[in-house]
A protein has these predicted regions:
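Hydrophobic core segments of alpha-helical transmembrane domains in multi-pass membrane transport
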Residues: 44-56, 174-178, 198-202, 220-225
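N-terminal topogenic module of multi-pass integral membrane proteins
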Residues: 2-118, 122
Length: 240
């Protein structure tokens, strides 16, 4: 019995080492930072999520009572509806993930961001606006729950391997589908802000050479068209 347990431990350790080496071949963790810095970064990201979630719902609920300048800007750019769609939140989560110190830190930071954003948005909706859109809330709660796993994977997209390249193209494909609407005979951006989001996403995910970046962009469009054919992808078009 003891021998069996010992062998199992060896097997588990072997698998763990193989997995670590596999992930490190994609992207290595950055230089370590202190625990205090980790805590400060995470708290800052939490408050960023709370601020953006509150601001998003404020624009949505008070759009006819906004201050003059903000109302003018919102009238031109339709910021309220833009913040109610998925593109900007995917971009922010992507940036938080990629620029985190490690894949684990990416998971923690992105999860904390969405907890702050989603909680503040729906608390404002329920207690100030006076209504709670349960169906949309459940979608966002579910997305928040899986965000650590998605962030963990996204962190590796800035690696140097072929798998990192594929991950970057796949992420950009999802971003393409939430920024643009298209079919056999038409192609439109949802708004100028979504165009900016996609451009920033392309810059963030860019490769070492212009040729590689162009190839990534091309592959991402092909993947976007393929993904658009799947019914489950429609969930990412939801609004809050």
């Amino acid at each position: 019995m003891i021998k069996y347990d010992y062998e199992q431990i060896n097997k588990s350790e072997f698998v763990r080492v193989i997995m670590i080496n596999f992930l490190n071949d994609i992207r290595n963790a950055e230089n370590p930072i202190s625990n205090n810095r980790k805590l400060i970064n995470t708290i800052a990201i939490l408050f960023l999520g709370i601020a953006l979630g509150t601001f998003s719902k404020y624009l949505d609920f008070r759009q006819t009572e906004l201050p003059g300048v903000l109302m003018a800007i919102n009238g031109v750019l339709d910021i309220g509806n833009f913040l109610g769609r998925f593109a900007i939140w995917i971009l922010i989560a992507l940036c938080i993930s990629i620029y985190s110190n490690s894949a684990i830190r990416a998971s923690i930071n992105v999860f904390v961001f969405f907890v702050g954003m989603v909680a503040s948005y729906y608390l404002y909706s329920n207690y100030i606006a006076g209504f709670f859109p349960r169906s949309y809330a459940m979608i966002w709660f579910g997305f928040t729950a899986v965000s650590p796993l998605l962030a963990f994977v996204c962190w590796y997209a800035k690696g140097k391997s072929k798998l990192a390249f594929i991950l970057s193209a796949l992420i950009l494909a999802v971003l393409f589908n939430v920024c643009f609407v298209y079919g056999c005979w038409y192609f439109n951006a949802k708004s100028v802000l979504e165009v900016i989001v996609f451009i920033i996403g392309l810059i963030v995910l860019r490769r070492d050479t212009l040729r590689s970046s162009a190839l990534m962009g091309t592959i991402s469009i092909v993947l976007a068209v393929l993904l658009d054919d799947f019914v489950f992808v429609d969930i990412i078009y939801c609004e809050k």
